[in-house]
């Protein structure tokens, strides 16, 4: 599977799931990863004749480097898998904008 992986160096008081979600929302990384996902989706459509979002795209992995602790599995790791429907809708929306400009 293909994943979007991004490293973050944010200094947070806590690197548990709730703190990471708050950081994702505060910094608008959720918007960032949706844009990344649309870009990867478009690339895969062009490169793979049998591309299927559910089968080939594994999701988002944001690694908060300061929070990764081997003794605390999952600490410093944010994961998400945006729904295919959302990615297809965004892709169509961006395509319309490109056509409107042309």
Task: Give short role names for the model-derived ranges.
Residues 1-102:
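Structural signature of nuclease core domains in nucleic-acid processing machines
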